[in-house]
């Protein structure tokens, strides 16, 4: 089946090509999917999209013009797709529900440790032959209270890792995980309590109308002074301007993020020769206690292999008109 693979990146093409094994005719397109690039999918039977490719009502109509009714997502999240209209119009949409919870969990813990022990600053000093330790002090993770908001597959791995550090773990989720309670001594609390008690807060939940900007001015006010905030989940969970105000007031002592609400057109691209136009992001970059990575928490060989394998499986099922088990129905993101 001829498939247009939008937002294709060098780091993933080999994995996808290997998993495909010449089964489908894949057209790798570097550009992201948009009203201006959709015609590049002409004569294709399916499109394959990445996390920042938006499929809204306009794109759906244009896909119908090209007789394309199959959409394969190279991601677990699907808030960038108008699922309700897609289903009404008869589109088949499938995602990669799980690729490697370990990769994202490990990255989140890496952000915690790097912020705490000021690893980036220490490295930069060494490069300048400055071996002073002044200002590089951190704290013991052991004994700290970590609040995990969302205990799905990634949140569970976070709990297991940090339990090994000797952290006290509290969590918030609509569904309490009984195994985590027993294995990691996790205590489930309400949102107000997790904000008030946590020394470190880490987000691991989907983006929906209910969770959008769950980190906002009101909830930041409830947090401990000097709290560490980590987001490797969805950029839209955070009101970035409120976080900036929280950092300026020193309510937020550390901020680590791998996702950004307005990352489309910014992340996954080389802008080193251009002027940054996003003033909010530029302000974040100016803080010494902020550590940013560009949506790379998933980026391990294992995850890339799993994403590629599942994506090709979904395309196979589209072509054979059978269920893959990864279809997206009219669900909340």
Where are the regions a protein language model picked out?
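Rossmann-like dinucleotide-binding domain for NAD(H)/NADP(H)
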Residues: 226, 235-333
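Structural alpha-helical scaffold elements that stabilize or flank donor/cofactor-binding regions
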Residues: 39-40, 193-194, 219, 283-284
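Phosphate-binding beta-alpha-beta segment of Rossmann-like dinucleotide-binding domains, i.e.
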Residues: 89-91, 97-145, 157-160, 164
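Short glycine-/small-residue-rich Rossmann-like dinucleotide-binding loops
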Residues: 51-52, 199, 205-207, 233-234, ...
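An N-terminal-biased, well-structured beta-alpha scaffold segment characteristic
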Residues: 1-94, 216
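Glycine-rich nucleotide-phosphate-binding loops and adjacent flexible coil segments
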Residues: 230
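Rossmann-like dinucleotide/phosphate-binding beta-alpha-beta segment
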Residues: 134-225
């Amino acid at each position: 089946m001829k498939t247009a693979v939008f937002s294709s990146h060098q780091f993933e093409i080999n994995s996808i090509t290997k998993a495909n094994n010449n089964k489908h005719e894949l057209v790798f397109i570097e550009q992201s999917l948009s009203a201006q690039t959709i015609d590049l999918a002409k004569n294709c039977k399916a499109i394959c999209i990445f996390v920042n490719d938006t499929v809204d009502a306009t794109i759906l109509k244009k896909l119908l013009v090209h007789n394309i009714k199959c959409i394969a997502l190279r991601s677990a999240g699907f808030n960038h797709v108008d699922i309700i209209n897609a289903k009404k119009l008869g589109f088949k949409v499938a995602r990669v529900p799980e690729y490697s919870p370990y990769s994202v969990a490990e990255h989140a813990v890496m952000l915690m440790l790097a912020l705490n022990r000021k690893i980036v600053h220490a490295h930069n000093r060494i490069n300048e032959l400055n071996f002073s330790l002044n200002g590089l002090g951190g704290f013991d993770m052991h004994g700290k209270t970590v609040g995990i908001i969302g205990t799905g597959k990634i949140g569970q791995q976070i709990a297991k890792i940090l339990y090994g550090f000797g952290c006290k773990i509290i969590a918030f989720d609509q569904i309490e995980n009984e195994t985590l309670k027993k294995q990691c001594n996790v205590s489930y609390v309400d949102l107000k309590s997790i904000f008030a008690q946590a020394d470190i807060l880490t987000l691991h939940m989907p983006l929906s109308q209910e969770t959008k900007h769950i980190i906002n001015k009101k909830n930041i006010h409830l947090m401990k002074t000097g709290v560490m905030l980590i987001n490797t989940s969805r950029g839209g969970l955070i009101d970035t301007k409120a976080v900036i105000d929280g950092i300026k007031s020193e309510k937020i002592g550390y901020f680590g993020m791998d996702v950004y609400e307005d990352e489309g057109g910014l992340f996954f691209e080389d802008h080193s020769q251009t002027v940054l136009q996003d003033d909010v992001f530029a302000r974040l970059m100016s803080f010494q206690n902020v550590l940013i990575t560009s949506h790379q928490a998933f980026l391990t060989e294992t995850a890339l292999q799993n994403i590629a394998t599942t994506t090709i499986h979904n395309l196979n099922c589209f072509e054979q008109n059978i269920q893959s088990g990864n279809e997206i129905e009219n669900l909340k993101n």
